[in-house]
Amino acid sequence: MQILEKIIETNGLIFAFLFVGLIMLLSFWISKNLLNNKIPGAAIAILIGLSLAFLGDKNGISDIPFFAGIAILGGSMFRDFSIVATAMSADISKIKQAGLAGVISLFVGITIAFFTGALIAIIMGYSDIVSITTIGAGACTYIVGPVTGTALGASSEVIAISVATGLVKTIFTTIITPVIAKKIKLINPADAIVFGGLIGTTSGVVAGLAATNEKLVPYGALTATFYTGLGCLLCPSIFYLVLTLL
């Protein structure tokens, strides 16, 4: 056992990849076999991650020597790399297929989500601009929230709330999309492109459209992918400045 502990502590980052991989494997198994894909595997993995964050001390589970590599894997370097990697999978020329409506939906979706989240933060009792901006960004997606919070120097508690906010949005989108699809006439690729731009949470949009019509998934995912990148640009800069002026 001591030999195993020494090997893991020496190769902390490798073990962190293995540990997160096992969580993802378990999460997607639960999503597929127990929840009938009604909740995305990514959302379940985030819930597990947030739960594990309460273990340890200030730095969460990474304070436990056995899981020290999580601190590196969960740091800003790998986080930003993941975001860039996601954006690289989308061809910028393809967004033109959505026309002006697709572009407008991105800006409208991010703006509505951000200021709705900011209002929720104020109702929750937060008064400082950094916290309000971070939680507002979390209402865009659970990636935009921590990116914005880190950029502005928000507390770990506020960043966790922003992630939780985005997670609720993802689960809600997954469940409600197939229910309201016919009512909002979400029936063709053009509709899916606008829908992805308005909602933005990629995993929620993909899961929701998959339950509605699998042929619509690539189109919704297209604009939803750009949503995260655009949110990471707007929230800690322009939207933050807007809130400071209000």
Positions of PLM-derived features:
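Hydrophobic transmembrane alpha-helices of secondary-active transporters
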Residues: 49-54, 67-97, 143
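Entry/N-cap segments of selected transmembrane alpha helices
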Residues: 9, 13-20, 73, 92-118, ...
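Interfacial helix-loop-helix linkers and transmembrane-helix boundary segments
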Residues: 31-39, 61-71, 88-104, 124, ...
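Hydrophobic core segments of alpha-helical transmembrane domains in multi-pass membrane transport
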Residues: 16-29, 45-56, 82-85, 117, ...
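Structural signature of hydrophobic alpha-helical transmembrane segments
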Residues: 7-20, 66-82, 108, 128-137, ...
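Transmembrane alpha-helices that form the ion-translocation and gating core
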Residues: 104-145, 172-187
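Alpha-helical membrane segments and immediately flanking helix-loop junctions
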Residues: 129-172, 189-226
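Short, strongly hydrophobic alpha-helical membrane anchors
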Residues: 1-10, 246
